[in-house]
Amino acid sequence: SMYYHTTSLANSAADNSYRYAGANPNNYVCFGSTASTCPSGNLYRIIGVFGSEVKLIKATSYGSYKWNSSENNTWSSSTLNAGTLNGTYLSGLSSTWQNKIATTNWKVGGMSQNSSATAKQYYDTEIGSSSSSTTYSAKIGLMYVSDYGFAASPDYWTTELFNYEPSKSSNWMNINLNEWTISRSSDNTN
C-alpha cells in the first residue's frame, strides 16, 4: 500500500511524502531500459514520492561493496559513493537515463548509534527537524534508515528498529541481506 505521510498519519514522517509500505506492494519500475521485458539489472522499486521526485532502490542486491575502503565514514569521500554509485554505476547509464536522475542534496551528517529509536525518530535525526546541516550533492545515494523503517507495515512504526525482526515479513525492503544506508554514525569519524 502507499501511505500519504501527513501530520495526521500516526507515527509517520509527516513530510507530505507518499511511501510504499507492507509485505509486497506493487511498486516495481524498470529504469535504464526500454525492453518490453525489464532486464533484472534494471528492475527497481519505488520507495516513495517526495515532492516532484521519485526515490528508487534496486529490487535485488547490487552486490557486495564496502561503504569505504579507508577508515573514514564521510559519505562524500566514500568509495561506495564516488567510486561505485556516482562513478561506475552512473557512467554505465546512457545520458538519456542519467538526465532522468535529479541531483539531490543528501543529508549525510549522521546520527548517534541509538538502538532505541523508531522510524520517525530516525527520520527526524536523519532528514527531519533534528537533522544535521551537512549535505552532499549527488545523483545517486543510499536509503536512509528511516526509509527501511517506514517500508514496514504501519503497525511497526512505533517499534524500535533494533526490534524490527518481527516486521521482516511485512517489510518489502527486507531482502534478508545486510544493507548499507547513507546515514553514518556520528559517534566517531571512522
Describe each region flagged by the PLM.
Residues 1-190:
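Long, domain-scale functional regions
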